[in-house]
Amino acid sequence: MSYPQGYLYQPSASLALYSCPAYSTSVISGPRTDELGRSSSGSAFSPYAGSTAFTAPSPGYNSHLQYGADPAAAAAAAFSYVGSPYDHTPGMAGSLGYHPYAAPLGSYPYGDPAYRKNATRDATATLKAWLNEHRKNPYPTKGEKIMLAIITKMTLTQVSTWFANARRRLKKENKMTWTPRNRSEDEEEEENIDLEKNDEDEPQKPEDKGDLEGPESGGAEQKATAGCERLQGPLSPAGKETEGSLSDSDFKESSSEGRHDELPRPPRAGESSPAGPATARLAEDAGPHYPASVPAPGPHPSAGELPPGSGGSSVIHSPPPPPPPPPAVLAKPKLWSLAEIATSSDKVKDGGGGSEGSPCPPCPGPMGGQTLGGSRASPAPAPARSPSAQCPFPGGTVLSRPLYYTAPFYPGYTNYGSFGHLHGHPGPGPSPTAGPGSHFNGLNQTVLNRADVLAKDPKMLRSQSQLDLCKDSPYELKKGMSDI
């Protein structure tokens, strides 16, 4: 039977003496009455045995202890049989069973290896051997950790922590031979220390940044093909594009590199929009997905679309030189058919309202793209007619662009009855410097309001599947066109 240190149980040989009548006047039995047993034993009322009982007067037992005039002599006589709790006489040694290192304070016995704080050399040798065999993938699975914990007599937490520290050490020494990942496959739950999370997240961040910069630095071709993938794939947590399609800097880079290199265009998107960030956002939405500079970018991988014509970006930017003829514009997109457009024209009113507020239709068919360019072109300083807007679909079965500005279209989709001279302005190219005139004032105001709606809409609409985004807005726009 073991007792914690400092709580002294008298040996059985001595207890026989203390079982005398309680109020005898003898010195031996005096301090051992029931009310004094704990007081002189050194546990609760006095830190050391006899320190209070024999030196301080107390009404309970003072009359039974007849001391001489010298209390020190009496105390010495008393200690001759009581002894200190740390002074184990031969008689006491046999009956005191507590462990000298306070084993009762822990749930493990003293010699248990699970109680050990430090890993032994054998344990670390085993772990190092496993690590050397798995340098390509130093992430033990849960089963391997349990096996190693049994072999090394360590806990599962200790094994996980050891591997986290080992990976960090190797990384600091530039001996990393594996590709870092966020967590190991078996999801080390709370057992793992935070060091491992920080350890593996940091190398991930530069790689993510590199991935995000890849499409921008690659010029307009990659931008054209990556436009729909960005929105259809899972949203990357680090990317700024997910907030409002593409960030300002993103769009400026792509417009400066891709468009200005191959087809010289005077201004950038951010600089050419006088109405500020709202119209810049409109420019971003339509711009990156219709790069006019690419004569024939490959079809979009995700939607199977044909390359958009050069109308969308040229409407938003200041007047361009005459564009190359749009290639292969007669092929029909695969996501919807003309039959669907013809049969489901009852949604036109809903589609018209939602089409302008929808955030960045990523990969619309050519028709939807031109419509978007038309409806969003108004905030730009140049009037929205450009040579590329003249007839994006020569000989196509769907309506060509100039018809969108006639009276039946705009009263239904915006709140304007007329657009001033825009109706009668079918010329191939307006003057480059024509700023927004008086007929643009109401238009600017309303489009800016719609831009505010745009800024809020992406957050709501992104919760839906990204494929719907790629489908719906151009789909409804084209349905609207079939009604005219």
UniProtKB/Swiss-Prot annotation:
Role description: Establishes the cardiac repolarization gradient by its repressive actions on the KCND2 potassium-channel gene. Required for retinal cone bipolar cell differentiation. May regulate contrast adaptation in the retina and control specific aspects of visual function in circuits of the mammalian retina. Involved in craniofacial and gonadal development. Modulates the migration of progenitor cell populations in branchial arches and gonads by repressing CXCL12.
Residue ranges with Basic and acidic residues bias: 203-212, 249-265
Presence of the UniProt keyword DNA-binding in the record: yes
Protein's cellular compartments: Nucleus
UniProt keyword annotations, A-Z: DNA-binding, Homeobox, Nucleus, Phosphoprotein, Sensory transduction, Transcription, Vision
GO cellular component, one term: nucleus
GO MF entries: DNA-binding transcription factor activity, RNA polymerase II-specific; DNA-binding transcription factor binding; identical protein binding; sequence-specific double-stranded DNA binding
Biased composition (Low complexity): 375-389
Gene Ontology terms describing biological process: cell development; embryonic cranial skeleton morphogenesis; gonad development; neuron maturation; regulation of gene expression; regulation of heart rate; retinal bipolar neuron differentiation; visual perception
Keyword match 4Fe-4S: no
Gene inactivation effect: Disruption causes increased KCND2 potassium-channel expression in endocardial myocardium leading to abolition of the cardiac repolarization gradient, a selective increase of the major cardiac repolarization current, I(to,f), and increased susceptibility to arrhythmias.
DNA-binding region(s), residue ranges: 112-174
Tissue specificity annotation: Not expressed in the developing metanephric kidney or adult kidney.
Designated name of the protein: Iroquois-class homeodomain protein IRX-5
Matches recorded under CDD domains: homeodomain (cd00086)
Chief place where the protein resides: nucleus
PTM sites of type Phosphoserine: 273, 465
Biased composition (Pro residues): 318-328
Sequence segments annotated as region (Disordered): 176-393, 424-443
Family, per entry: Belongs to the TALE/IRO homeobox family.
